[in-house]
Amino acid sequence: MRGQRSLLLGPARLCLRLLLLLGYRRRCPPLLRGLVQRWRYGKVCLRSLLYNSFGGSDTAVDAAFEPVYWLVDNVIRWFGVVFVVLVIVLTGSIVAIAYLCVLPLILRTYSVPRLCWHFFYSHWNLILIVFHYYQAITTPPGYPPQGRNDIATVSICKKCIYPKPARTHHCSICNRCVLKMDHHCPWLNNCVGHYNHRYFFSFCFFMTLGCVYCSYGSWDLFREAYAAIETYHQTPPPTFSFRERITHKSLVYLWFLCSSVALALGALTMWHAVLISRGETSIERHINKKERRRLQAKGRVFRNPYNYGCLDNWKVFLGVDTGRHWLTRVLLPSSHLPHGNGMSWDPPPWVTAHSASVMAV
């Protein structure tokens, strides 16, 4: 890239120097001499207004694309409302099909114990999906307090010009700094941070379970409905009523939607589960990856200062303190607060052990 740029800039600079030299000569036409002089004046004015010795080509590109960034951020902000409505409509359509189409069919074929199991599991799963999605949307992710000087800060935010605690990052869409920011989720129309990260992951997890349950449970009904739809164009045409045709198409829609969401959302859930097991957020993964490469080039090993071990990472993330909390705080709806305030973090055991060994020496 640099070689191509130098090949293009070399002839351009040579032509410009020739024009400047011609401008000094008296034989040069007055028109050309005036153009060269205006070029110099314009260059001086531009540099006096915009020149910065600390800036470079990257700064100029960022400044040029700032209107584009602003447009994208505002479009995503408004599209977040559309995505939230879309999630509610799609989820509501699946629930309506389950009650209006699936339930009348299984009432005639399933046994009473099997019906009871499906009844309790499906409603338990639905309650957890609705609860965690509502909490993820309405719960603020957490913002660093402004005007306080007693918080431990790592740096100053270049956008907010406020102290930025550890694991805090600026969201260009919300235009605020977010504590332990993971990402901005358009499907929530909200940032995923310290106080709603658990709700986001729990929604993804239980929504994946619900989609897998619907896809697997409706497999036989889907096959029958799909085979019936294939016979619509036969001669003579089958004698299906309007209600039966709607039921067939609804079952096919249910199976394809739940299967596709189970695959896509399941992959996202597994990815976030891996990050949680490592004690990282989505942003910290990229930061730690660069830091790991930098230290590896120096022959050193990078260790995540927020990794407490796989099990302890999950306990901190889910807010679990006792064995009973796995039932009351994970498998049942719970609005308990996460561990910590999102601004200061306890050091992991390996950091404490290293500090103790240094003090002993």
UniProtKB/Swiss-Prot annotation:
Membrane topology: Multi-pass membrane protein
Class of the enzyme per the UniProt entry, highest EC level: transferase
EC number: 2.3.1.225
Regions of this protein lying in the Lumenal compartment: 99-116, 220-250
Keywords, alphabetical: Acyltransferase, Apoptosis, DNA damage, Endoplasmic reticulum, Membrane, Transferase, Transmembrane, Transmembrane helix
Role this protein plays: Palmitoyl acyltransferase that mediates palmitoylation of proteins such as PLN and ZDHHC6. Required during embryonic heart development and cardiac function, possibly by mediating palmitoylation of PLN, thereby affecting PLN phosphorylation and homooligomerization. Also required for eye development. Palmitoylates ZDHHC6, affecting the quaternary assembly of ZDHHC6, its localization, stability and function. May play a role in DNA damage response. May be involved in apoptosis regulation. Involved in the proliferation of neural stem cells by regulating the FGF/ERK pathway.
Protein name according to UniProt: Palmitoyltransferase ZDHHC16
PANTHER family documented for this protein: PALMITOYLTRANSFERASE ZDHHC16 (PTHR12246)
Species of origin: Mus musculus
